[in-house]
C-alpha cells in the first residue's frame, strides 16, 4: 500500500513537472490585440456629454468618432425642452443645408456637410435665440478623388448630395451639386450605400472573411461614423442588401464550404442578428447553363443585387455570369420568371424565359435590378459582349452600357422595353462591370456608369484591375423627363452612386454600439503536423513577413507567399492541438467588382488566414508550418 502511495505521488509529481516544463516551453509573448471600432467608439461615447454646456457655450467636437472628418457634434442643455434648427452655410442655396431636431432639453446636434480646409459657418437656432458657430476643418487627403467635369441645370436641382462607394482607389463620400466634397469616411466601408428607414446608413465592415472582397458583415452607422450595430455573417457580405418591411435584412452572402461564391442569400433578424432564412442558388439554377464569357466554376452566377417586393412576395436577383435577372417566390424558392437571352439554356428552363413584345434588347452582365413602385423593373445593362455566342461578341470600342426599364406581363410571360438611356453615348459610357440605376420619381432617374476604364487609349472590356487600366472614369447622370439635368465625372471607378439628402431622421443616439451575429467554427486540417521538431523564427521565416493579430472574435495570420507554398497554422496547448490549412492561392476572378482590399499587385500573394474563436478556449502557442518546416513563433493567443 505504501509503495502504491509513493508510486502515485511520484506520478503526480511527474505530471506537475511535465505541465510546468510544458508551460515554460510554451510561454511566449501574447499576440497583439486589435481593438475593434465598436470598442474604440464605446470609449468615445463615454466622453461625449451635454453636462455643463449651454446654447451660448456648447460642447463642439469635430470628427467625434475619428472616421468622418467633415462632421461635428454640438452638445448642450437647455433649461426646458426646445426645438433646435441647424443650418450649414454653403456657397449657394443648393449647397446650404438645414435640419430641425426633435424637442428635448439635452441636445446632441450632428453637423454634416462641412467643407474641407475651410472655416465653416454654422447657424443654430432655438425657439428664442440664434447663434453662429465657426468650425475649421483639415484639408482632404492627398489621394482624394475630385470631379473632372460637372454639368448641371440648376433650375431643376435640389440640395441633395451624390453619395459614392469606391470600386478602385477612393473613399466612400458625397459631393454636392458644385462637385465639392461634403462628407467622407476614412475607413474602407463599401458596397451598397443607401438609407435605412431609420435614417442610418448600412455599409460593409472593413474586415474580410475571405479574399478578395467578402467582408465580415455590415455596419449600421450615421454620417458621424458612429456605429449603432455590427451584423456578423459567417459567409461574409458582398454587393447588396435589402431592408424588408419587418426590418429584417436580405443580404448577399456565400456558403464558403460548398466551393462556390456569390450564390447564397441570408435573411438576418435585426433584433438579434440570427439568420432566419437562406436561399442557396445552387439548388435552384443550373451551374452549367447560360454561361457568359466571364463565368467560372467558382463564380458561376455572380449575384450582384437583391430586391424584395412585398406585394408579390418575389425577390429579384441579378446574375452577371449567366446574363440573367431571375425572379423567385420568396416562400417556395421556385422560379417565377427569367429576364435575359435564352441562348444556351436547356428546354427545362426555357419555359421561365420571358418573350419580348417589341424591339427589346436583352441585358448582359447587368447590375442593380430593382422593382419600381408600378411593378416595372429597372436595371443597369452593362452590355458585356452583347451576345451569348462568341462569334457574335461585340468589341468594347463598339459597345455601350445603358439604364433600362422593362415591363413584365407575368400572366402572358412577355416583356416590353419601355425606357433606355446610354446607348446613344456609345463606348464613352461603356462600363463592363459594377454601376447602378436608381428610380427617383416618374421620369426621374440617376444612372451611374461606374466602371469605365482605358489602357493605352483603348477602352477595356474587363474590370479595371484585371485589365491593368491606366485611366479610370465614372459618369453619373441625373435625368428628368428625358433631359440631363446633372452629370458628374470622376477619374476613378465607383461601385454605386445614390442621390440622398444630407439629413434624414437624424436624431443622434449616444448609445453603445452592439455586435450581433456570429462566426462558425473554423474547420481544422485533415492532415496533422507533429511538433516533435521545429525551428525558432529565423531569416527564412522572416522573409514571409508574418503578422499575427487577435481580433475580437478571431485570430488573423497574414503573410506574403509564393503560389506554390504549402502553409499550415498550428495552435497548440496541452492535450489540445489544432491544425488549420492556409491555402496560398487566389481564384481566377473575372469580375473584380471592388479592388480596395486587394494588395496582390505583384507575383507574390499577401493573404490572411482567419481562425474563428468559436469552440476555442484557453492559451495556445502559435506554430507555422511552411514548406516542410515547422516554425515556433514567439507568440501565444488566449481565447
How should these model regions be labeled?
Residues 93-97:
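Extracellular/oxidizing-compartment recognition motifs
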